[in-house]
Amino acid sequence: VSQEHPHLEQGLRAGFVNRTYPALNEYLPQFLVNDAAKHKKVLSSILSGLRSCDEFWFSVAFVTTSGVATLIQTLVALEAVGIRGKILVSQYLYFTQPEALRRLLQFRNLELRIAVDGDFHSKGYLFQRKGNLYDLIIGSSNLTAAALSTNTEWNLKVSATNE
């Protein structure tokens, strides 16, 4: 990892071993929350990941029309340049809105799947960048406007390679 991605190794070392180790912010693990007072939203990190990725995967328990609406302009832009994505959702507690799924199905570059067995309740957003680098956001945020912008949510963003 150090020869191909020295900045990634430095970021992991600074984030998990020694805070004083020099590293670029882009590669540091980040705790992501919605904080109106600091003008921070989980949504900003999701949008940033989408705008800089070559491919992406979402795995969320719930999707709502409000959640899709927060991403719609970026999804349109990704479709225009052929960036592919896969989204896995659940029907757990029947919270996912059918209209949100219909809206996502309109994108030719997206593959949408629904987990129908068990209590599928994961929440993860994975973005592949150039050079086989990946950014993963994992935590409590579903694909709803409230979860991505206002709810009390805890998420961790980490970067890694595919090795």
Q: What are the language-model segments listed below?
A:
Residues 1-163:
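PLD/PLD-like phosphodiesterase catalytic module centered on the HKD motif
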